[in-house]
Amino acid sequence: MNKGWLELESDPGLFTLLVEDFGVKGVQVEEIYDLQSKCQGPVYGFIFLFKWIEESRSRRKVSTLVDETSVIDDDIVNNMFFAHQLIPNSCATHALLSVLLNCNNVDLGPTLSRMKDFTKGFSPESKGYAIGNAPELAKARNSHARPEPRHLPEKQNGISAVRTMEAFHFVSYVPIKGRLFELDGLKVYPIDHGPWADDEEWTDKARRVIMERIGLATAGEPYHDIRFNLMAVVPDRRMKYESKLHILKMNRQTVLEALQQLIRVTQPELIQSQKSQESQSPEEAKPANSKTVAPESTHPDGADEPASQGHTTATQSPPTKSKPVAKASASSINGVPPANPNPIVQRLPAFLDNHNYAKSPMQEEEDLAAGVGRSRVPVRQHQQYSDDEDDYDDDEEEEVRNTNSAIRYKRKGQVKQEHAAGAADGQLSVLQPNTINVLAEKLKESQKDLSIPLSIKTTGGGAAVAIVTHSQPSPTPSNESTDTASEIGSAFNSPLRSPIRSANPTRPSSPVTSHISKVLFGEEDGLLRIDCLRYNRAVRDLGPIISSGLLHLTEDGVFCPLAAADGGKSSPPSIKPGEEAQVTIKLDEKEGSEASGSKEKELLALLKCVEAEIANYEACLKEEVEKRKKFKIDDQRRTHNYDEFICTFISMLAQEGMLASLVEQNISVRRRQGVSIGRLHKQRKPDRRKRSRPYKAKRQ
């Protein structure tokens, strides 16, 4: 097996697939492009590729050079996984194993776990023999290597000595017991670079060591060689995003339950009217729906957008018939007949039952201004993706379909207007995105000082609702995921508008928009030109809070963080003293209805932020799945054997009588350009020496 190990390319996709073939779970490999930028998130180790120029490399022996940084203590060396490279072309496997087998919080799988247990306490040489005699490792790594070309015998002797010494070598940098070690299989001992500072991560020290090695720190003239590569072994981002999505979806359900509980306490008449609506049969809903379409289309406030109201019959229906029409639209869009005409679905009251939470708020604004119906199918397709080995796409698709028409809410301003005027046939309208911007901005301002609890007193019963959140993400393995999803995802992958388009103020062209804002907030048109970038900043700031812990709504109406996620993929991070803030929402009978509206606005803004974070993480998860598919495609192209195709093509040229002419033409072109072919270049030097000796003798 000593001559059966093929060379591996320094490609993060190749190493990621190789880790999977080894049986390791929850690990991937990424390439580092900037050594001067701080590494985000946990890193298990670095794999560094550099040009190997030592003369002793050709003898394939372990170097015996020892300096002051070498660790010669056998107890320390044998207790870590450090193996001598005894097989050529195995440095990539040695570097990868040196990172994985020195980590305690990685699921190694059966193969590597058995090797780690078997070689515990072995010397580096014995561990090197263990790697060389593991057929599972050789088979896995050779399956991702490019097939070696078949060299002609005469070409082997023509390689110069300078080219023979040019080779590349993999080493690893791993943190072990508070110190940074460089593990090189061609050196007899590991190299200890010492501990890192208290105010920095181990990756910061590793980056400095690598920069000094390649000469970037001194910017010297001899260090202009850029033929090096650095890769990081990190946790699998797919699992991290799935865990975050699980927490966010649980929190979304919790906030929805809190909103429903609030409506039951503050406005019980809406719950009673909803029950009366559900008791009516679908047959009575159809004629009532047809009667109300014409008055809505001729409403004076909605004159600027008749097309939008004409296409959205289901969402613009009267309060008494909104539920059956929503069901009918959902079944017609999905193309699947409903199994039960009256299914038992957990719904929000009419106050919150007219908004589509599965749709982007910015897309709603654009659709409303453009006159496009809200039940468009392409809007929901941005979350549907599939992968052969991943099974989470089906759940996402079902959830998007269910929430598209079932979860809607009735705007609060219309409820106030109906209560004041006593009208029985009020108008329904969707809450505009510019009002959502104001809600998020107010919530952001209220949480600037997280040490001060926020108390909002409203009318209703005596129950108390306390929202316990975190002020910053916990320094656990998902420390950087929120920044990635909120900042990068919102700019590139989020269904929200891009910052360039969001820089324009929201459109106050419709009088309906102005009327809704005045009813909700009692303010003038100045709020209509809120910059959407402020909403994006609010979402980014609230992202670490709503996605770092799993909230639970108890029976007595209190939000509390769970100690462990029940049935979830991961438990929420631990709560440290001083790192949590309580937003207490009390229901008091002495206060008026204005405080109730402010509390509902806060919960709606929080719900919007949760939805935005879910959209961001779903986009990031989809990107990681697509990246993994591209890794497999590149691997198939790399490992495919093209010899059969080439031989078939050459034989076809020979049958057509074109091969001889092409070969002769190619040889003549190379001779004119001075390019040597075959043995012609090798025979010139001996001939030149034989002719020079008699020439010198004649002159003497």
Curated annotation (Swiss-Prot):
Residues 386-399 have a biased composition (Acidic residues). The gene is BAP1. A motif (Nuclear localization signal) lies at residues 688-693. Pfam families: Peptidase_C12, UCH_C. It comes from the Eukaryota. Residues 273-282, 317-332 have a biased composition (Low complexity). Residues 641-669 form the ULD domain. Residues 4-235 form the UCH catalytic domain. Keywords: Chromatin regulator, Coiled coil, Cytoplasm, Hydrolase, Nucleus, Protease, Thiol protease, Ubl conjugation pathway. This is Ubiquitin carboxyl-terminal hydrolase BAP1. PROSITE patterns: UCH_DOMAIN (PS52048), ULD (PS52049). GO terms for cellular component: cytoplasm; nucleus; PR-DUB complex. Its main location: cytoplasm. PANTHER family: UBIQUITIN CARBOXYL-TERMINAL HYDROLASE, UBIQUITIN CARBOXYL-TERMINAL HYDROLASE BAP1. Deubiquitinating enzyme that plays a key role in chromatin by mediating deubiquitination of histone H2A. Catalytic component of the PR-DUB complex, a complex that specifically mediates deubiquitination of histone H2A monoubiquitinated at 'Lys-119' (H2AK119ub1). The record marks 184 as: Important for enzyme activity. It catalyses: Thiol-dependent hydrolysis of ester, thioester, amide, peptide and isopeptide bonds formed by the C-terminal Gly of ubiquitin (a 76-residue protein attached to proteins as an intracellular targeting signal). It is an enzyme of class 3 (hydrolase). It is found in: Cytoplasm; Nucleus. GO terms for biological process: heterochromatin formation; negative regulation of DNA-templated transcription; protein deubiquitination; protein K48-linked deubiquitination; regulation of cell cycle; regulation of cell growth; ubiquitin-dependent protein catabolic process. Belongs to the peptidase C12 family. BAP1 subfamily. The active site is at residues 91, 169.
